[in-house]
C-alpha cells in the first residue's frame, strides 16, 4: 500500500496500482469467452468473431463469421503444439467444401493460446471517456518501428470488461494517418466450457496450401490485430510479394505507400475469404495499387477481383 496526494485529497493506493489515480492495468484473467467485431474501414468490412481462451489449459479457439471458419490453437498437441483450422474452400471441382488444415509448431515457434484481447503491457491510463453511453477507462500505448507509428487504445470498465480496441497508424515519412482498424467487444465472461476446445471429429487435416508465407495468417487471423507492433506478419509478406512480381520502387516514400496499399489489400482478401463465399480472392499484380488506380484501370468502377492468382 502507498499514498498519493491528488490536489487536497490523500488517496490510499494498492501496492499493484499504477501511479495515475491509483488505477491498476486491467487484467482479463487466464480464462474467458468474448465476442467481437473487427472493422476494417479501408475495405468497409465488418467481421464478427467469437473467442474462447484458456491460458492454463494451453489452448484457445476463435471462430470467424459466425463459425464459418474455426481455429483451434492447442499447445499440448504433438511436441510443440498444433493449430487446426476448419474452413470452407473453393477448388476447381468443389464450392465451399469444408476442409481441415493443420499447422504444427516448432521448437523455435511453439504454438501458444491466442488471446482475442491485447496484451496491456506498456499501456498507460489516458482518460475517462463515454463509449456508447458507458463511462470507460481509456488505456493507451504508442509504438514505433522505422516510419510506422501506431497508437493503440482500449476502452474498458471495471471489473475488467473490454468494450473497444482501436489502432490508428501514422507514417512519419508520408506524414499521414494511413491505417486504422477497430474491434468492438461484447458478451465478455471470465469462464468457458472445456469441451469447446475439441475440434470436430471425423475430419482428416492436411497441410495448408501454398503460398507458404501466408500460412500463419490463414491459421491465426487475429494475431496481427491484437498484437501491438507496427510491423506485423502481414508487413513481412510484402518482401515475398515484391520478389514475385519484380517490384522496384523509385523512392523510399513510394515504397512506404505501396506497402500500405498491399497491407490493406491483404486484409481485404483474407477477411473476404473467411466469409465462405462462392468465390475466393487472392493477392495479384495489382495488390500494391491504390483504390483510385484500380478504379482508373476499370474505367472508374471499383469491382472486387474475384479471380484468385494462381501463378
Regions found by a protein language model. Give the residues of each.
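N-terminal leader/targeting segments and the immediate start of mature chains
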Residues: 2-59, 91-99, 128, 201-219
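An acidic-aromatic
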Residues: 48-113, 162-182
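A positional/structural detector of protein chain ends, strongest at the extreme C-terminus
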Residues: 1-3, 310-311
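Long non-globular sequence segments
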Residues: 66, 87-92, 97, 143-151, ...
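Generic short beta-strand segments
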Residues: 35-41, 65-67, 140-144, 168-169
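Extended beta-strand-rich segments in extracellular/periplasmic secretory proteins, especially
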Residues: 24, 29, 83, 96-173, ...
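Amphipathic hydrophobic-ligand
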Residues: 45, 72, 147-148
Amino acid at each position: 500500500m502507498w499514498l498519493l496526494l491528488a490536489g487536497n485529497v490523500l488517496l490510499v493506493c494498492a501496492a499493484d496500482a499504477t501511479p495515475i489515480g491509483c488505477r491498476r492495468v486491467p487484467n482479463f484473467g487466464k480464462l474467458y469467452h468474448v465476442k467481437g467485431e473487427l472493422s476494417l474501414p479501408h475495405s468497409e468490412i465488418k467481421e464478427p468473431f467469437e473467442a474462447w481462451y484458456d491460458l492454463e489449459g494451453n489452448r484457445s479457439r476463435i471462430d470467424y463469421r459466425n463459425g464459418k471458419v474455426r481455429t483451434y490453437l492447442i499447445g499440448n498437441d504433438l511436441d510443440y503444439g498444433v493449430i487446426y483450422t476448419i474452413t470452407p474452400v473453393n477448388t476447381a471441382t468443389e464450392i465451399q467444401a469444408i476442409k481441415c488444415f493443420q499447422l504444427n509448431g516448432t521448437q523455435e515457434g511453439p504454438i501458444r493460446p491466442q488471446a482475442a484481447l491485447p496484451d496491456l503491457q506498456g499501456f498507460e491510463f489516458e482518460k475517462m471517456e463515454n463509449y456508447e453511453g458507458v463511462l470507460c477507462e481509456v488505456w493507451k500505448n504508442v509504438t514505433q518501428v522505422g516510419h510506422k507509428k501506431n497508437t493503440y487504445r482500449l476502452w474498458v470498465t471495471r471489473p475488467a470488461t473490454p468494450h473497444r480496441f482501436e489502432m490508428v497508424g501514422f507514417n512519419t515519412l508520408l506524414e499521414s494517418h494511413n491505417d486504422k482498424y477497430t474491434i468492438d467487444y461484447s458478451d465478455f465472461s471470465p469462464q468457458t466450457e472445456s469441451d469447446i476446445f475439441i475440434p470436430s471429429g471425423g475430419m482428416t487435416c492436411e497441410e495448408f496450401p501454398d503460398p507458404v508465407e501466408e500460412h500463419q495468417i490463414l491459421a491465426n487471423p487475429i494475431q496481427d490485430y491484437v498484437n501491438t507492433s507496427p510491423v506485423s506478419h502481414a508487413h513481412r509478406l510484402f518482401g515475398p510479394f515484391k520478389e514475385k512480381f519484380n517490384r522496384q520502387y523509385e523512392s523510399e516514400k513510394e515504397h512506404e505507400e505501396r506497402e500500405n496499399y498491399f497491407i490493406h489489400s491483404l486484409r481485404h482478401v483474407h477477411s473476404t475469404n473467411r466469409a465462405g463465399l462462392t468465390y475466393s480472392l487472392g493477392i495479384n499484380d495489382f495488390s500494391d495499387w491504390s483504390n483510385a488506380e484500380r478504379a482508373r484501370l476499370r474505367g472508374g468502377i471499383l469491382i472486387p477481383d474475384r479471380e484468385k492468382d494462381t501463378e
